[in-house]
Amino acid sequence: MSWRSNAQRTGMNAQPLQGARRWGGAGGAGEGPSSSGSPPSSYHQPSHPYQSSYSHQSQPYNAAPAPPTSSSSSSSNPRDAALAAAAAVAASIGIKRDRDRSSDAPGSNSYAAPSLLTSASTADGSGADAGPRKRKSRWGDANDKITIPTAIGANVSAQELDKYAIQVRLDEISRKLRSGDFVPPDRERSPSPPPTYDNQGRRTNTREVRYRKKLEDERVALVDRQLKLDPNFRPPSDYHAIKRNQRPTEKVYLPIKEFPEIKFFGLLVGPRGNTLKTMERQSGAKISIRGKGSVKTGKGKMDADEDEEEMHCVVTADDEASVKKCIKLINQVIETAASTPEGENDHKRNQLRELAALNGTLRDDENQLCKNCGNKGHRAFECPEQRNWTAHIICHRCGGQGHLARDCTQGRAGAFNGAPPGAAGTGNRQFDSEYANLMAELGEPAAAVDGAATAAGGAVGGAAVGPDGKKIPPWRNPEVWSQPGFGAPRGGDAGRGGWGHRGGYNNRGDRAGYNQHQQQQHPHAYHQQQQAYPAYDQSAPTAAPGGAENADQQHRDYSAEWAAYYAAQAAAGGAQGADPSAAAAGTTAAAEGAVDYSKEWEEYYRMQAAAAAQDGSAYAAGTQA
């Protein structure tokens, strides 16, 4: 019968092995026969080598060897060998327990060997659960406790000392708050403040409340300091709740009564609340405006206490530094509004600018680039570097700067359309004459305008001042009428009527001349005039080129002709049914010595003839060329 393992035995052959091997033992009972079919001989080896080797391994490093037990006898009973092995294992466990206990005691460096009594008790099984055993694991003990050392070494830094002192004080405060023993003795207490009560009539500042709050505030401050020193510090469980309920709060009252015309609410809130949000973001605090006028009527409901107070700002933050910074920002806005006029307040100007940008009505002139220099802050017409284009304009007639040739007020080099050179500067003389007339009408003496009169009429030769010393009006002064270039256009028919029988002062050519007008209205009188004055034909052809010189040399008196002319005009008017009273009035006025302008008219027509002759000579020269 071959040897099989216990798991392979079935049926009738399922019998227990004789001397089955156990953990910590050396074999089975050993009463079975030692015939063929027995297990290998190694199961019946004496247990002395194994027992002795395990005993040696279980001994501590500096402990004495265990004394021999009863199982180390020369008996070959397997049961005794198993009991001896179990006793050895129990002894090793006891040795480990003793070693752990001895390690907890300070100054112990050796381990005591177990006694025979301990070995015997463990062998009997009565000492297996003799005491509580510490549960060990690879992650450490189940209830590790970190204690504060009571001894301070010499090489400890100042930061470590602060951390140690703060931790000791925190433990002391926590113990007092848990036990309720936080009220000091009578000799150590300070005088009590006046009592305060809430809305229900309960006192809010009792001795217990005051000292508890004092300790809680101190603990919160110490925890904040400890967190700064040691980021790994774990604050107490109720720290966050206490700090949330004890956030520092301050009130800043607005000077509404002192400055009733200033809107502090708008200056603090800003457009759509952006100013208030900016201050909260900069300081890290929360700002709430409370009091009278802070809430519109019907928009919200305030507490009774807040409604009775003046308008103020409630500043709340996590720490005192944030509260102080926020209060400083609020005071800056108040001081600026109280000390600066409204038109010069940059804070309000920026708010209005921001509001316009939010509404989409901003005209950004400050950020707009100047088209002249490319800088910001001004427009092109306000540019300080703008080039003076007017100073670079040069007149090609007079050579002056700042005006064009068409706007030139100086004398021209040549006459327009062949005018004589002597007619240059008539424009200036005309302006001077008008100025002199204005001064004369204002009552200035003749001597004051003598220079102007001389400048106005001296060049042409006409008298600018009458015999009585008064200035001749411009409509009566022939020198004013004689403008340069007054004559026929190129290729036209020249004549005393000017521009092809469409003459007249300041005539643009769209009205008939004097002769044509007289022919159309008074044909009978015109024929009579032609018969009476054959030598002075107003519709005569163009004079010879030398006519101008002859006219200048001759000084004929045309007073008789003018008298006959006026008589013929009066007769013609009477023949056509004119009013006899008007004719009589005219005759009476002439008889009474009315002012006679015959010489002025004579001079006027003389100049017209000279101008016409000059134009005719220029035209003839151009035709021959």
Curated annotation (Swiss-Prot):
List where Low complexity composition bias occurs: 32-61, 70-91, 110-130, 516-533
Where is the sequence biased in composition, kind Basic and acidic residues?
A: 177-190
Q: Output the SUPFAM superfamilies linked to this UniProt entry.
A: Eukaryotic type KH-domain (KH-domain type I) (SSF54791), Retrovirus zinc finger-like domains (SSF57756)
* GO BP terms in the entry: mRNA cis splicing, via spliceosome; regulation of mRNA splicing, via spliceosome
What is the primary gene name for this protein?
Answer: BBP
Q: What role does this protein play? A: Necessary for the splicing of pre-mRNA. Has a role in the recognition of the branch site (5'-UACUAAC-3'), the pyrimidine tract and the 3'-splice site at the 3'-end of introns.
Q: Name one GO molecular function term.
A: mRNA binding
Disordered: annotated segments: 1-154, 177-206, 466-533
Q: Name one Pfam family in it.
A: KH-I_KHDC4-BBP
Q: Where is the composition biased (Gly residues)?
A: 22-31, 488-503
Cross-referenced InterPro entries, in alphabetical order? BBP-like, KH_1_KHDC4/BBP-like, KH_dom, KH_dom_type_1_sf, SF1-HH, SF1-HH_sf, Znf_CCHC, Znf_CCHC_sf
| Family the entry assigns | Belongs to the BBP/SF1 family.
Record's compositionally biased regions (Polar residues):
1-16
Instruction: Give GO cellular component annotations, separated by semicolons.
Output: commitment complex; cytosol; nucleus; U2-type prespliceosome
Q: Give residue ranges for domain KH.
A: 253-330
Q: State the protein's name.
A: Branchpoint-bridging protein
Where does each CCHC-type zinc finger lie? 368-385, 393-410
Q: Which UniProt keywords apply?
A: Metal-binding, mRNA processing, mRNA splicing, Nucleus, Repeat, RNA-binding, Spliceosome, Zinc, Zinc-finger
Its annotated compartments are: Nucleus
Q: Which organism is it from?
A: Mycosarcoma maydis
Q: Which PANTHER family match?
A: RNA-BINDING PROTEIN RELATED, SPLICING FACTOR 1
